Amino acid sequence: MRALAHAAAAALVALALAAALALLGNALTRAGVAHQGEQAWADWRAARSPWRWTLRQPRDVVASRAFGPGRVSAGTDALTVAFAGGALQLGLRLARPASLRQAPLLALHLTRSQALPLSIIVRRTLAAPACVAAAGRLPATAATLRIDLAALRWRCADAPAVMPVRAAMLRLQIAGPAGARIALREAALLPAAPVALTAPLSWSAWRAAAPAMGSVPVVWLPARFSSRLLAQRDALWRRDPAAVALPAGVMPHAPAAPATMPWDWIVIALCALLMLLAWRAPRHLTQRPAWLLQALAAMLPVLLVAFGIGDSQTPDLRSGTLITLALGYALLLTLHEDAALRPWHWLGAWRAAWLPLLPAVLASVLWLLQARHAPQPADFARYLPWAALQQFLVLVVVARRLDAALDRRAATVLAAATLFALGHAPNTALMLLAFAAGLWWAWWFLRRGALLPVVLAHALAGTLLQAIASDSGWLRSLAVGARYLGSGG
């Protein structure tokens, strides 16, 4: 009877945690969309647009390289482009479609330049034919060049055309002789005249209204579930890429000024200090408190990334530092592991090794019901190392220490599953799937101590879920962090 009561209590706690995770994922997504909208609103009011590029590293352009004969490299304060003879293309990254109707001026700031022929290449959608326009020549010396895209002679699919009003792809095509070099520091799309912003419109009012040619609509998105909210935002941008998207009820205002203190780095330094203290804890604490402190220290980088510390559309030095801290600390604990901890191994008894596959079986059922495409072996191979790192950190490093420190198996399973789910924030649907699978995998691992069956099951389930992800579906993608907030349109 007591065992039944404990199981019922654990089930209630699991349901409460799942509800809390859903609320958290939705709240983080709402905050991210609000920040995007506030920044876009402030840009339009300041006679700028949301499409600006700071170019310093190869990663600042599409594919981190030049398309064609040449290469890009990091300069001191600009992106250096070296020509190998012929025309090359530089792709400007678009986190959302660009509105050339509202921002038809292209500004290029060059710190080193030569009078080389320049063309602009645009695709309305990624599947649409390319539209090309000759834009004259770059300046002979360092300067800021402004190009009125609407005044250029455009050709789309080899036929004369007017300027595309939206861009899902935007490239610069520059022809230069071998040995020529330029340095491009910044690029931006700018409005030709001050832009009027509407008062916030409800979703239904915006859908019923005719597109306003001379103003930028500010639209409230009513959805609450994260994937649905992002799908509405993308639908808004497909109709009007210039539109400002805000969660319902959020009044537009300029975002707060960036902090003058490097708070992200201060938090990361405190995280590293806690890890150091936890590493030295066994010298000053008894086993159980030391194990608990080590588990909490290993969890901290995952929690910081989940809540947006050091995360961005392109992973930067902060997120890389947190990931390195987590993996380095996990490796350190493993190499100098307390012999009193319960041992783990890669393989266990084969008769029980199939049990971790149950979440993958459920994922295969979902795939059969709503497959978008067939999963490929290469997808599984790419996912496998990431699955191994996650499960090693959650199960081998954290769960075993929590289990030994708390001596409460149900609490350990719930904590490990929650950590696994938080690592997938703010993707609400993926957080809930990870929590459910994490409960099963943590329970099985703590009973059997074998890691490889869980890793394989995780990689298989992730590969199948990737094959059903859809920008407009309940599972938008397997992306996490700020990358989840990227445009699907």
Could you describe each region identified by the protein language model?
Residues 2-260:
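Beta-rich carbohydrate-recognition modules and glycan-binding surfaces
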Residues 283-299, 348-354, 409, 450-451:
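Membrane-interfacial loop-to-transmembrane alpha-helix junctions, especially the N-terminal start
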